[in-house]
Amino acid sequence: MSASRIRAKCFRLGQRCHTRFYDVLKKDIDNVRRGFADAFNPRLAKLLSPLSHVDVQRAVRISMSFEVNLGRRRPDCVCIIQTESSGAGKTVCFIVELKSCRFSANIHTPTKYHQFCEGMRQLRDTMALIKETTPTGSDEIMVTPLLVFVSQRGLNLLQVTRLPPKVIHGNLVMLASHLENVAEYTPPIRSVRERRRLCKKKIHVCSLAKKRAKSCHRSALTKFEENAACGVDLPLRRPSLGACGGILQSITGMFSHG
């Protein structure tokens, strides 16, 4: 295969990874809007909260735009989240540059270093452009740029880097409207038929999981009775804690120790 065809293939794979990531992030945001806090995708919950001390599950306003055309730059995603905490509102504007990785075993390679440097330049330019284009107003907005490395297979978050946030003042509503108007990608809305098919699939998976859990429980009881008859003391099992929250509460684990 020629070098040009390899580059074209890599470009297509990267594009596909971007759109899949957008779709998952959009579903997360939609779940927040509908009040389904427990319906987060576990990968997305790490992305925003720990970097800004904003609880996205308590957002009063969320605006998200993809492939935003700002002229010199086109950030992959710009997300504006407004929350209320103890009566005081807080607004964060996240700029997300996404870098997809075909091979995720080693994040420290020349190719990924080039992607990192390119992403940093893109974020700095985008911050300046957003500051220039923000309509005049009194709203305080904290602009937070994020460089996100994600694996093409599985959409696993590999590394998230945040540039120092900057506070700007402007009209929040007009800024969100402007960004939505210049966005060049909108995640597709699933048809009713497709939603029903996915719902049936989820119900089927849940029923299988319940049957499997019952089967495991029965076998565990049988094993316990056998060991008890032999006079064996079994250790108590602590219930496992499921991941609560989801790519909006996972860019948390990466920064919770920092």
UniProtKB/Swiss-Prot annotation:
Listed GO CC annotations: host cell Golgi apparatus; host cell nucleolus; virion component
Keywords: Host cytoplasm, Host Golgi apparatus, Host nucleus, Late protein, Virion
InterPro entries: Herpes_UL24 (IPR002580)
Gene induction: Expressed late in the infection cycle.
Keyword flag Repeat: no
Keyword DNA damage: no
Subcellular location per the Swiss-Prot or TrEMBL entry: Virion; Host cytoplasm; Host nucleus, Host nucleolus; Host Golgi apparatus
Function: May participate in nuclear egress of viral particles. Plays a role in the dispersal of several host nucleolar proteins including NCL/nucleolin and NPM1. Since deletion of host NCL/nucleolin negatively impact on nuclear egress, UL24 supposedly acts on this process through its effect on host nucleoli.
Family of the protein in this entry: Belongs to the herpesviridae UL24 family.
Protein name: Protein UL24 homolog
Species in which this protein is naturally found: Varicella-zoster virus (strain Dumas)
